[in-house]
């Protein structure tokens, strides 16, 4: 009974929304999408177009996947093609170009292997001898990812990787980030009309930490590189990390010059959203399908909006009468800002 009620409410009272995934098994994505039927998956471009034209998006949603991890893209693309679901993959182009990996990927592998002692690095001294020192450092790293240029944390991250290899007897390959999808694979997958590749910036750096010149470069260069390799115009961006802190005050205005939309990790539906601050609903492997339905209904409800504004859909998170705890994802993206 509860299952049928949630499905009815999702179809009838949820505004259009964008799902955000990172690294996740395809069977979990399939379970989530099946759980929110009869809501219908549509291309991101269609959802953005309908929102921009003030047309109803009720009962519609788009699927997006961040970061361009090779095995993840391949597995999910197979699922989307098999099920006939259009989907958008956001690519950080430097990761695809170099396969060097992003700081949060290195950190995820390094954290459990760090020696619990005082460590002297070229970039500074870190004391990990306390019982909660590693967890405290992890919190500081996440703040840096969301607010600072990568030069303030990436060199230290690589130094820690060298230390773990040297002192813990771990092979570098064992702690290296997963390989990205390759550009030839991107080109091949992009020939299928269901699969689209868009921009996740160049370096996966918080855009609030970039100079005006670097901000424009990240947006223009990543757009042009994705267009070159796919043969399709790159018209959509996902902000790295996606929190308001990491996006900053200038990025949306710049994004409007280069893209039709730019997605955040703020929660809500797309009905009245700024196209260059578009909300998404992040879902993670550990979430239940019941949690996913409740989160979407709570954060994308149009019930209160219909009372006050019959023309435009508006996100009314608080009015839905529920509280959905924000999740922390595998990429270090988290909560309303992921």
Language model segments and positions:
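C-terminal active-site subregion of NodB/CE4 polysaccharide deacetylases
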Residues: 1-64, 70-71, 192, 202-205, ...
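Short acidic, Gly/Ser-rich segments with clustered Asp/Glu that frequently serve as metal-coordination loops
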Residues: 67-74, 79
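Metal-dependent polysaccharide deacetylase catalytic core of the NodB/CE4 family, i.e.
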Residues: 19-22, 59, 81-245, 272, ...
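Beta-hairpin (beta-strand-turn-beta-strand) motif
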Residues: 65-68, 92-94
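Glycine-rich, phosphate-binding/catalytic loops in enzymes
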Residues: 79-82, 254-255
């Amino acid at each position: 009974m509860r299952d049928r009620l949630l499905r009815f409410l999702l179809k009838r009272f949820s505004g259009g929304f964008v799902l955000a995934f990172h690294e996740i098994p395809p069977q979990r994505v399939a379970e989530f999408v099946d759980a929110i039927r009869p809501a219908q998956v549509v291309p991101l471009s269609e959802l953005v177009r309908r929102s921009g034209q003030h047309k109803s998006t009720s009962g519609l949603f788009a699927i997006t996947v961040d970061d361009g991890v090779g095995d993840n893209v391949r597995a999910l693309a197979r699922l989307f093609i098999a099920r006939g679901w259009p989907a958008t993959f956001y690519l950080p182009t430097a990761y695809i170009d170099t396969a060097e990996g992003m700081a949060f990927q290195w950190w995820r592998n390094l954290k459990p292997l760090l020696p619990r002692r005082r460590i002297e690095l070229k970039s500074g001294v870190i004391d990990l001898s306390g019982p909660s020192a590693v967890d405290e450092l992890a919190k500081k790293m996440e703040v840096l990812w969301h607010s600072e240029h990568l030069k303030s944390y990436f060199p230290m991250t690589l130094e820690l990787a060298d230390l773990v290899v040297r002192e813990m007897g771990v092979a570098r390959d064992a702690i290296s980030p997963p390989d990205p999808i390759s550009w030839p694979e991107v080109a091949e997958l992009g020939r299928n009309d269901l699969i689209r590749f868009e921009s996740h910036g160049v370096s996966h750096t918080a855009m609030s930490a970039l100079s005006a010149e670097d901000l424009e470069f990240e947006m223009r260069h990543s757009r042009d590189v994705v267009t070159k390799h796919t043969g399709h115009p790159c018209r959509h961006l996902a902000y790295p990390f996606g929190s308001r802190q990491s996006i900053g005050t200038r990025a949306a205005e710049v994004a409007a010059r280069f893209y039709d939309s730019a997605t955040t990790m703020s929660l809500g539906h797309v009905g009245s959203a700024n196209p260059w601050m578009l909300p998404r609903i992040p879902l993670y492997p550990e979430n239940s399908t019941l949690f996913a339905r409740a989160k979407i209904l709570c954060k994308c409800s149009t019930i209160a909006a219909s009372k006050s504004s019959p023309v435009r859909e508006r996100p009314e998170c608080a009015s839905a009468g529920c509280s959905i705890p924000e999740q922390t994802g595998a990429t270090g993206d988290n909560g309303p800002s992921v």
